[in-house]
Amino acid sequence: MIALASPHLDEIRQHGERDYPFECCGLLLGRFETSNKVVIQTYPISNAREEEAKRNRFLIRPEELMRGEKYAREKALDVVGFYHSHPDDHAVPSQYDLEHAWPTYSYIVVAVESSKATDVRSWEMEADRSRFNEEEILPLPLGEGPG
């Protein structure tokens, strides 16, 4: 399960809408609590793919990932996951997403149709990297963790 406040979900939706028709991407910063992840902050990153490929792929450059990890450490947070959008497609990870994901992290996918975010779902990869399982998104009041 991943827990986050509605303003964080709004930030993800708005990022997807702003970057439409291209994929947006970013980090989910927070903490691991037993089998749950709690998002404290989103960390938007510019999609580094070449322009035409941005319609159905995103790329986080290693230096951007390192910058985000450093920022998280400075705030006493961890990278607990990633988010990206699927323009004019479903909020379901693609085969490409599966091939490039890592276990343990959450992957939030926002569907954006005609510049409007329509669905947000979260996924976690099996430990053997064979597939994603959908995970529950627990909405939290801002500043709270799961009880």
How would you describe each model-predicted region?
Residues F82:
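Conserved, mostly hydrophobic/aromatic
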Residues M1-V79, P87-G147:
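Conserved beta-strand-loop surface patch within small alpha/beta domains used
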